[in-house]
């Protein structure tokens, strides 16, 4: 890897992790379109650490509050403050974690074709558009999440294992389909990313333990810094943009990208 490849791939990870356009799809497509060599597992670990750091830093106050509400809900055995949201984040991670571990090799080898990415980009782009329209028509969106909502969103999140789906895209879609407000949909989706990214990091570190790779520390540091800053900026941008215009720009982008991929 050289500096230009490091910058581009770190930016892609940082920008696309929290945009509903699929970071994994773009990280697969760019090297294929540019004929770059594989960036290596160590680089993947580092840029994922960057995006994880960004979302934790952005939501640090809420995470602290959720942690204490979660803790006291266990002690007192009742819902305390936003403990239901905290439990939702925890329980909502279990399905994708289990399925991801069981089918890890299948996903990594058999679901990375451009054709599959093209289909998922289009199909889930259309679903995102429908969910956005449904949310716009919903005059009484829910400001709290129920256990049924958590169950539905967590099941839908499993689809994010397929490249091109977008974890943030499918979870925001699911949240809006069950009637959650746009604000809560984004919030729950981004909070769900914390344990999901953490789990993927653990799996990558396990794989990394069995490998021997030469590393360029300066490029890894550069990748971490760029992915962290770009991810943090993206979180701010996405929240403001969706609040103003909804999901339309992302739906249009996904449809254009999906059609383009079919001609490759």
Curated annotation (Swiss-Prot):
Q: What gene does the UniProt entry assign to this protein?
A: uppP
- Protein's name in the database: Undecaprenyl-diphosphatase
Q: Which GO terms describe its cellular component?
A: plasma membrane
Which organism's genome codes for this protein?
A: Vesicomyosocius okutanii subsp. Calyptogena okutanii (strain HA)
This enzyme catalyses: di-trans,octa-cis-undecaprenyl diphosphate + H2O = di-trans,octa-cis-undecaprenyl phosphate + phosphate + H(+)
EC number(s)? 3.6.1.27
Chief subcellular location equals membrane
Signal peptide: which range, if any?
A: none
Superkingdom of the source species: Bacteria
* UniProt topology in membrane: Multi-pass membrane protein
């Amino acid at each position: 890897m050289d500096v230009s490849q490091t910058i581009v791939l770190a930016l892609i990870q940082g920008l696309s992790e929290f945009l509903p356009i699929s970071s994994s799809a773009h990280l697969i497509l760019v090297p294929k379109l540019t004929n770059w060599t594989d960036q290596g597992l160590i680089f993947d670990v580092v840029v994922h650490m960057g995006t994880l750091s960004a979302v934790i830093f952005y939501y640090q106050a809420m995470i602290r509050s959720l942690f204490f509400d979660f803790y006291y809900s266990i002690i007192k055995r009742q819902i305390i403050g936003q403990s239901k949201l905290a439990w939702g984040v925890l329980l909502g991670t279990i399905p994708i974690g289990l399925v991801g571990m069981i089918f890890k090799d299948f996903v990594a080898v058999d679901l990375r074709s451009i054709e599959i990415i093209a289909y998922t980009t289009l199909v889930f782009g259309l679903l995102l558009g429908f969910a956005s329209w449904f949310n716009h028509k919903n005059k009484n969106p829910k400001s709290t999440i129920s256990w049924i909502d958590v169950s539905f969103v967590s099941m839908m999140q499993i689809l994010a294992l397929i490249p091109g789906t977008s974890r943030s895209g499918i979870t925001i879609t699911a949240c809006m389909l069950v009637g959650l407000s746009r604000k809560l949909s984004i919030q729950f989706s981004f909070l769900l990313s914390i344990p999901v990214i953490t789990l993927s990091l653990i799996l990558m570190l396990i794989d990394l333990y069995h490998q021997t790779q030469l590393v360029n520390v300066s490029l890894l540091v550069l990748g971490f810094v760029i992915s962290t800053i770009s991810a943090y900026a993206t979180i701010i941008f996405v929240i403001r943009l969706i609040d103003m215009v909804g999901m339309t720009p992302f739906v249009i982008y996904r449809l254009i990208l999906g059609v383009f991929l079919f001609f490759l």
